[in-house]
Structures are given as C-alpha cells and as structure tokens.
Amino acid sequence: MKTSVGVFLSASDRVSPSLLEEAKNFGSRLAEKGFHVVYGGASCGSMGALAQGVLEKKGTLTGVIPEIDILQELVQPNLTEKIVVPKMSDRKEQLMEKSDAFVFFPGGLGTLDEITEVLCLKSLGAKNCMKPVVFYNYLGFWTPF
C-alpha cells in the first residue's frame, strides 16, 4: 500500500504563477516517488496545479470535496478517488484520516484554518493527527510564523 501525503493548499486563482509552478512540480515529485496524494479536490489555484503535476506523472490522487465545490464545478475531473462530504469541516476530517503525513503549502485563510486544526488536535494527542507535519516554506512564506 502506498504512503499517502495530505497536501493542504489553496484553490484561489489569485496566486503567483511561480507558486503554481512550484505546486505542479511538487505534485510531480510526489508521484515520481510513489506517494499517493490526498488533497482538497479542486481543479483551480495551487490545488489544481498540484493535481496536474501528479496526474502528468501517472500518480494517484484522492480529492476530498465539499458539496459547495461540486455545485460550483471546481472539481478536478481526473481524480483516482473522489470523496464528497457535506461540509468543509468534514473535508478536514477526511484529509486527516486518509493521510500518513501532512504538507502545508503556502495558502490563505482556508490553509491557516487547516493548519490550526491539525496542530491543535496533534497537541491533544488525537490519533488521526499524530503524523509528520511539513511546512513547505516556498520563498520564506512560513518564516514569519
């Protein structure tokens, strides 16, 4: 069974082209190394770029998608596995359950919310969060924290 890496990142289209390229390259590297990628399931922003990188290298990809994203047609169409959940909080729970490690890519408020929840639960000893955590510090994004 492949090791699953949960990647938390942005679906916003208001990210720099260099960050999109970095996300795509990261997805490619994960696929080349044989990791299964679990992420938020979007086809846009750095989420979409990550998925593109994974899929171009014939990697496997699980998208955990809240119903609101289905309605807005933001879903990556070529997912290996698609999990639809009612709410954003359910998405976080599934991402934590399905991942063997967590990577926090530069993102916005949603990513910060996910970081806070994972680290809080990890500090409390929650079983689904007692996994390695990596902050992908692209261009020093996480340095102030």
Over which residues does each language-model region extend?
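N-terminal alpha/beta PP-like core and its mobile active-site loop of ThDP/TPP-dependent enzymes
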Residues: 18, 86, 98-101, 111, ...
